[in-house]
C-alpha cells in the first residue's frame, strides 16, 4: 500500500507519496501563505487525480501546523524530528548530522550514538544565523559545513 506524508509547516506545505518499496514516486513543495485549509484541499484533490486507482493510502501528517490538522481529521501525526531521523537512517546510512532549516526554527540532529537534537532560538529560524551557531558549536567554519 502506498504511503502519503503531508508536512504542514509555518510557511510551506510539503507532501510525498511513497510506493510499497519505499521509493518516492510523487512530491510537492509550496508556500501556503497562511491559507492552510485551501492549500490542503487543493493538494488532496491533486493526489486523488494523480492516483485515481489507489483507493487507500496510509496517511500521516507532520510539521508545526500538522498536529492540529491531523487531530481534526483523525489522521496520525508524526513528529518531524522522528520522521527526519527515520528517513535519513533508511536512505543515507553513513549520515551523521542533519541540519533542518524551517520557517520558524532550525534543528540539528546528531545521529551517531543515539539521537541528539539541538534547536536554535525562533528569532533566527530559517536564517544563516543558525548555521553560524552550529558551526561554532562544532568548532568548524560555516564553509566546512
Protein language model regions, located:
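A short acidic Gly-Thr/Ser loop motif
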Residues: 7-11, 63-64, 101-105, 127
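Active-site cofactor/substrate anionic-group-binding motifs, chiefly glycine-
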Residues: 80-99
Amino acid at each position: 500500500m502506498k504511503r502519503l506524508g503531508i508536512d504542514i509547516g509555518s510557511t510551506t506545505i510539503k507532501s510525498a507519496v511513497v510506493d510499497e518499496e519505499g521509493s518516492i514516486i510523487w512530491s510537492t513543495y509550496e508556500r501556503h501563505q497562511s491559507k492552510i485549509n485551501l492549500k490542503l484541499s487543493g493538494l488532496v484533490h491533486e493526489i486523488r487525480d494523480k492516483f485515481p486507482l489507489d483507493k487507500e493510502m496510509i496517511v500521516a501528517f507532520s510539521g508545526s501546523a500538522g498536529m492540529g490538522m491531523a487531530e481534526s481529521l483523525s489522521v496520525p501525526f508524526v513528529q518531524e524530528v522522528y520522521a527526519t531521523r527515520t528517513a535519513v537512517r533508511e536512505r543515507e546510512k553513513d549520515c551523521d548530522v542533519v541540519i533542518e532549516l524551517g520557517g520558524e526554527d532550525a534543528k540539528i540532529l546528531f545521529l551517531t550514538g543515539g539521537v541528539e537534537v539541538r534547536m536554535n532560538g525562533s528569532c533566527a529560524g530559517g536564517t544563516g544565523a543558525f548555521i553560524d551557531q552550529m558551526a561554532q558549536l562544532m568548532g568548524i567554519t560555516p564553509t566546512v559545513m
